[in-house]
Amino acid sequence: MSTLFLRTLREDPADADVDSAKLLQRAGYIRKAAPGIWTWLPLGLAVLNKIEDVIREEINGIGAQEVHFPALLPREPYEATHRWEEYGDNIFRLKDRHEADYLLAPTHEEMFTLLVKDMYSSYKDLPVTLYQIQTKYRDEFRPRAGLIRGREFIMKDAYSFTVDEEGMRQAYMDERGAYERIFQRLDLKYVPVFAMSGPMGGSASEEFLAPMPIGEDTFALAPSGKAWNVEALHTPAVEAVDCSQTPDATKRATPNARTIDEMIAFANAEYPREDGRDWQASDILKNVVIAVKHAEDDEHDEPWRELVVVGIPGDRTIDMKRLEAQFAPAELEEATEDDLKAHPELVRGYIGPMGFGPQARGDDGTAETLRYLIDAHVAEGSAWFTGADEEGVDYYDLVYGRDFKADDVVEAVQVRDGDMSPDGSGPLSFERGVEIGQVFQLGLKYSEALDLKVLNQNGKTVPVWMGCYGIGVSRVLACIAETHHDDKGLAWPMNIAPAQVHVMATGKDEAAFEAAERLVDELSANGIEVLYDDRRKVSPGVKFKDAELIGVPIIAVAGRDTVNNGTIEVRDRDGSNSENISVDSVAQVIVDRVHEALK
């Protein structure tokens, strides 16, 4: 370590917001270059390379072949798939000296597709799976959590190409199995969850989430063991309500009752329910105006904005991430004052369903109006207390399906503990996690957009079926650090630690240093990776703190006991074991322990 490019820190960096970011910087694995951009130091690269080796072994094992694409990519392929516009501000764009447009790669679907198109033209060439481990770039608005949410990151992405859908599904299952083996070998707990495909497109997708409190993703767990990202969670069909005895809808004056609380208070005072119970938030249909920001498309030469009205139960809250997932790749935000002013039919505090959607388009269905969407929790036949699109007026007993309809049913509200699972196995519970991998069945999205076709067995030209499979390599490293540490520092699994044994000599007696050097030589001769702290002018206390901070699994100390008793202390970094072993046998004991840990 006297020559290792390393500087440990005793204090947490001021802007580090999660444990992994604090410890990886303090232990000398990474250094911050700019927000969301990191420099990898020798110890960090050692761990990163070992993680990549595990990934390569498993992905090569299912027959995939490694390639390497440039990070600087031309605009044209991304225009063909509309992702030049869909990515919006989330990508780094630049021009060369000739004013040609380029981007720093956020993903490489287009390039993989074009490469196969350029080289293959027959079903005889397929199936094939290609992958790379490459740096990606995304212009994160607010980078956070160290390596977990960065603007530059390392990713393994693979793409399968098959002649039919069955082949795509088989490739998907092969990759999925490889992912499970990878995360098991990395000692990283994971949960596969059903997910939305988002801008990637395709018919099916699963995320691999590492459960931890700092995770940005919330996932739902069913008693059956199945799990869903909340964006992909589908509300079980709500049983229709018999409305045959429900009175006709009536308008009633409700002055100055614009909020849910004001509506409840006014109704309980002025219009008591006939069944004797109080009005509650769950009796109210809340109508929320949402702005949908679309990218330019075939019908619009520039980005455009659409307002929609979404009806949800009054005791629920809009979940913008869940709702936005159904509009992907468009982005959503709450309507602004300018939006509302542009539509005088939107009466603040009294917005209801009757002024929008199918019921507002007239008998011939051609009248122009905003789309009206309804949350999946609203049952057919249910009666509601809701706005009448007039100042100071609300509807009572307005029935969904009888009095008003929706253009579409959407998943709009936040899910909560106790909601029924989609598979009907019981109530849901929720955890947070970090996405460490995702697999997609892309189908024909990219092959059709980029005209990737082959001749099949019958001589017919057909589009190629594709799958996409990603692992956030640098994020995986951060997640392992996040879950493998204590209050003293990091504690790496044996197979990816920067070294397998951390040997140190303490004190001033030359005999301790000689014993440490002999141990290093014996371990190295047996193929053991050693980090040797040979620093002469550093106190034992500092050496111990550095060893615990760096996190090598086995620590061997040559010091006073070595000089006096002929023993070397061998301790496990996790604190599970510590013993003094004779200098004559210590090397073999350590070799056996390392080999056992690597089984």
Curated annotation (Swiss-Prot):
GO CC, any one term: cytosol
CDD domains referenced in this protein's UniProt entry, alphabetically: ProRS_anticodon_short
UniProt keyword terms in alphabetical order: Aminoacyl-tRNA synthetase, ATP-binding, Cytoplasm, Ligase, Nucleotide-binding, Protein biosynthesis
Annotated SUPFAM superfamilies: Class II aaRS ABD-related, Class II aaRS and biotin synthetases, YbaK/ProRS associated domain
A GO biological-process term: prolyl-tRNA aminoacylation
Keyword check for Ligase: yes
Subcellular location, record wording: Cytoplasm
GO MF terms held by the record: aminoacyl-tRNA deacylase activity; ATP binding; proline-tRNA ligase activity
Annotated NCBIfam families: PRK09194.1 (NF006625), proS_fam_II (TIGR00409)
Record's function text: Catalyzes the attachment of proline to tRNA(Pro) in a two-step reaction: proline is first activated by ATP to form Pro-AMP and then transferred to the acceptor end of tRNA(Pro). As ProRS can inadvertently accommodate and process non-cognate amino acids such as alanine and cysteine, to avoid such errors it has two additional distinct editing activities against alanine. One activity is designated as 'pretransfer' editing and involves the tRNA(Pro)-independent hydrolysis of activated Ala-AMP.
Assembly and binders: Homodimer.
Protein name: Proline--tRNA ligase
